Amino acid sequence: MPGNRPHYGRWPQHDFPPFKKLRPQSVTSRIQPGSDVIVCAEMDEQWGYVGAKSRQRWLFYAYDRLRKTVVAHVFGERTMATLGRLMSLLSPFDVVIWMTDGWPLYESRLKGKLHVISKRYTQRIERHNLNLRQHLARLGRKSLSFSKSVEQHDKVIGHYLNIKHYQ
């Protein structure tokens, strides 16, 4: 736009790539694997849906309590396979204490590690779940804004996590 003329009647110009071209990363670059230690990591899953509530889509992610940032995330069904994909993304990081809620698959997957199971110690990640629901309308439980495709659902939420936590 030349000068400081107002641009009435036109949409503001943004430099965002179209969502179809987005390739959001799944692991943070703020924490260096091997050199930085994650003292307390909270893990949780968050429910969403694509098209209809019967087509559930789960966001699994790990949250660093001290740095207040998401470490890694994956999308999928609420199964051991999805949790396994998240754990493989987290394997390069040195995590001292894992904190989760009472979902039984966490217990079996974190066997042999220092693991605290308590709703009290997952308050921060639960608050982060609420922040995600407030910031992204498509994660709302009762909303007219829902994702129409799995690809767009994953890219929009992944892009949000990239902007807020990974860069």
Swiss-Prot record:
Pfam families annotated for this entry?
Answer: DDE_Tnp_IS1
Q: Name one GO biological process term.
A: DNA transposition
Q: Name one GO molecular function term.
A: DNA binding
Q: Which UniProt keywords apply?
A: DNA recombination, Transposable element, Transposition
State the source organism's domain of life.
Answer: Bacteria
Q: InterPro entries under this entry?
A: Transposase_27, Transposase_27_IS1
Q: Which family does it belong to?
A: Belongs to the transposase 27 family.
- State the PANTHER family in the record: INSERTION ELEMENT IS1 1 PROTEIN INSB-RELATED
Q: What does this protein do?
A: Absolutely required for transposition of IS1.
Name of this protein = Insertion element IS1 2 protein InsB
Q: Which source organism?
A: Escherichia coli (strain K12)
